[in-house]
């Protein structure tokens, strides 16, 4: 089950459960749409995977399965970002 992390790992922007700006990779690294698509160019700096919009957990399920409140703010090193982008940005996600 997804944690539904509450913020962008790079810039720290709030991304509550209801946010349509949240993007995740297959390991649930969480970024805002601006960081994921503009800064990172759809390449996760941790795994090299792509990003997809994070699903919104229905309100009726939040009491039983609450979204995480743990802030994860780990701004990525520019060198690491560039290294991953150069390696993967021209390769379609299904071919990485």
Name the predicted role of every residue range.
Residues 2-96:
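Intrinsically disordered, low-complexity regulatory regions in eukaryotic proteins
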């Amino acid at each position: 089950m997804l944690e539904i992390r509450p913020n962008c790992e790079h810039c720290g922007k709030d991304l509550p459960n209801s946010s349509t700006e949240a993007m995740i990779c297959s390991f649930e690294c969480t970024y805002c749409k601006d960081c994921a698509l503009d800064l990172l160019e759809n390449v996760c700096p941790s795994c090299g995977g792509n990003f997809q919009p994070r699903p919104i957990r229905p309100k009726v399920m939040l009491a039983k399965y609450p979204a995480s409140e743990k802030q994860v703010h780990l701004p990525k090193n520019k060198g690491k970002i560039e290294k991953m982008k150069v390696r993967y940005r021209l390769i379609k996600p299904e071919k990485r």
